[in-house]
Amino acid sequence: MPVITLPDGSQRSFDHAVSVMDIAMDIGPGLAKACIAGRVNGELVDAVDPIVDDASVAIITAKDEAGLEIIRHSCAHLLGHAIKQLWPDTKMAIGPVIDNGFYYDVDLDRTLTQEDIELLEKRMHQLAETNYDVIKKKVSWQEARDAFAARGENYKTTILDENISHDDRPGLYHHQEYVDMCRGPHVPNMRFCHHFKLQKISGAYWRGDSNNKMLQRIYGTAWADKKQLAAYLLRLEEAAKRDHRKIGKQLDLYHMQEEAPGMVFWHNDGWTIFRELEVFVRTKLKEYEYQEVKGPFMMDRVLWEKTGHWENYKEAMFTTSSENREYCIKPMNCPGHVQIFNQGLKSYRDLPLRMAEFGSCHRNEPSGALHGLMRVRGFTQDDAHIFCTEEQVRDEVNSCIKMVYDMYSTFGFEKIVVKLSTRPEKRIGSDDLWDRSEADLAAALKENGIPFEYQPGEGAFYGPKIEFTLHDCLDRAWQCGTVQLDFSLPGRLSASYVGESNERQVPVMIHRAILGSMERFIGILTEEYAGFFPTWLAPVQVVVMNITDGQSEYVAELTRKLQNAGIRAKADLRNEKIGFKIREHTLRRVPYMLVCGDKEVEAGKVAVRTRRGKDLGSIDVNEVIAKLQDEIRSRNLHQLEE
């Protein structure tokens, strides 16, 4: 006779085992109709799973995040159902949920085309619209293996053989004649799976191993209703317009080529943005009292063996050799910073020591994972490491957090999700040390009034960390900033300082990154601003144009005056119509266009236009220069008169 406690604290008693669906029906038919699954004592279960003992139960509907994830997972099964009907010889591999959707890896003889995807999506809709029930059956390991062996599903039998205990009872989900295996839960009926779209196909090795067979991965998105799906597809359309690869080409910022995969060729305008970012970061380094250093980009393999990188990270490291010595091109800056710290005797009076570098790093990312500026092999980190005592950790973390928010606000990022990752099972250091460290990180966040969520067990083996994830104008998440405590590396590399008691002690090391990779951050900014960089970042800030040859000398003189005032200005003296010039520079996203006709020359003024098409009228030259200087100096996100 289970007693069920609902989220509002109310209780309902039953004289027999019940399911989540039974409980929903007992509350009301509307809730039963909306019920997708349930959370029983904190665990997600199918709507039909029996509850025999007292339990806390929450009904999951499409309005819940978990409900949406279940819909997406069931759509992956629906994809399997449809593809087996269209191409019965298809072998099904895995079909998990991902951000905003799902995918399924399949093995079939034909190469799928866009026409095939459209046909597949049509069949999925036909099946879903019959609103069939999804039937769950728990079976023995052997029954599950026999079922998939009989169907020739060798990937499923491999999963059973290698990943599932013989004592387990796998869940088989029956979609009419199609059967799939999953821990669940799934929707009870396909009426919940009407709002989806297949998006693209790519290649994927079985289990991510290039030694295995290449499968075809079919991606899709799924939502709770038509409105959500339409809004998401609109966001995708907007994201395509903002694609930094497309804008980078339009604005001539950079290029990449096959001879240097994952390496950036910065063109003049793109490099101007890069250097302006460096200037900005340097002003903050000075403000927050960091030293700027520069380490070598290549060091002996022996050093990387000491740090543990060679054992755990060598697949991602580029190596070379000379004179019978093997060298590693650095994937990160921290070991080099410890070497700098180790030069000369350090006292507790020298701490905290804050060391920053624009470090040129390289990582051997898989070629299939490379993506414009967002995923590269060669990149520059705005990296810093703080050497301090245990007692100084809290204040230093506090300062790091202030610096993170100070810098992000300059770029207009307002939604920042913060997560605190705590001790994993395998770790170094005492529980007491972890207790204090985690408490210091949490206290620093609370002191700054920053809401955060814990990620239990997600910290590195050498210390807890804070992650800062930016959300852009399309609400896409970009994990950029980290503040990571490290109890391991300084000791591994023999870093020490003389403490107050005159004994050598190992410093705590704080890894701190804010922008992360400079290249990736420029990619993020390009998409955030759609190429309309704020004036302080814009490669060309002002173009001065003449209407006829009669104003050429005035334009040239004004351009020099702007340049001498520290403004990135260019003159356009081409023999083209003024409308053509304005249109061209507007497409180049130049913040300001200054037009000079005879009236402007006579009055010592310029006609000012913005790239958004706003006419600011005729303004005195010195006033324009002063206003532009102020906008650039303050790193204002908005243009004049906006």
Curated annotation (Swiss-Prot):
Zn(2+) binds at residues 334, 385, 511. Binds 1 zinc ion per subunit. Its EC number is 6.1.1.3. One of its GO terms (biological process) is threonyl-tRNA aminoacylation. Its cofactor is Zn(2+). It comes from Erwinia tasmaniensis (strain DSM 17950 / CFBP 7177 / CIP 109463 / NCPPB 4357 / Et1/99). Homodimer. It catalyses: tRNA(Thr) + L-threonine + ATP = L-threonyl-tRNA(Thr) + AMP + diphosphate + H(+). NCBIfam families: thrS (TIGR00418). It holds the Pfam family HGTP_anticodon. This is Threonine--tRNA ligase. Catalyzes the attachment of threonine to tRNA(Thr) in a two-step reaction: L-threonine is first activated by ATP to form Thr-AMP and then transferred to the acceptor end of tRNA(Thr). Also edits incorrectly charged L-seryl-tRNA(Thr). Residues 1-61 form the TGS domain. InterPro entries: aa-tRNA-synt_IIb (IPR002314), aa-tRNA-synth_II (IPR006195), aa-tRNA-synth_II/BPL/LPL (IPR045864), Anticodon-bd (IPR004154), Anticodon-bd_dom_sf (IPR036621), Beta-grasp_dom_sf (IPR012675), TGS (IPR004095), TGS-like (IPR012676). GO terms for cellular component: cytosol. Residues 243-534 are annotated as: Catalytic. GO terms for molecular function: ATP binding; metal ion binding; threonine-tRNA ligase activity; tRNA binding. The lineage of its organism: Bacteria, Pseudomonadati, Pseudomonadota, Gammaproteobacteria, Enterobacterales. Belongs to the class-II aminoacyl-tRNA synthetase family. CDD domains: TGS_ThrRS, ThrRS_anticodon, ThrRS_core. The keyword Aminoacyl-tRNA synthetase applies. Keywords: Aminoacyl-tRNA synthetase, ATP-binding, Cytoplasm, Ligase, Metal-binding, Nucleotide-binding, Protein biosynthesis, RNA-binding, tRNA-binding, Zinc. It comes from the Bacteria. The keyword Lipid metabolism does not apply. It is found in: Cytoplasm.
